[in-house]
Amino acid sequence: MKRACDFHVGDSFELVREADRYRPIYYAAVSGDFNPIHIDREVGRAAGFPDAILQGMCTMAWLADACTAYLEDPARVRRLRVRFSRPVVVGDVVTFRGRCVAVEGPVIRLEVEARNQRGEDVLKGASAEGWVEDLA
């Protein structure tokens, strides 16, 4: 597992996730968010979307997955900040691209962008803070 000295400003990482037909249903089952706009195509269309939309917290969980993969341990993720800018629609493919912007002792600061396959931002101002202690 990486130590704090192994993280460098400019490091980059990427994670790609697809919002398949079942993703909002699976997420509803574990979160309890059964709002029909997330699981019923016709409700999504009635709301002006081409299909059902993914729960925002599922998109945020994917952001956490991207940061966790880079930091190599979920316990290292200390803070996530995000603003939702566009719903993720069933069928969308979201690419999370992040980079390390600061290493200050044990604190690792990350900035992440998330875009769908049309190049549209689905998150704005996404950032994370990791804590990596070098225990001998």
Model region roles, listed by residue range:
Residues C67-F96:
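Mid-chain, well-packed structural core segment of small domains
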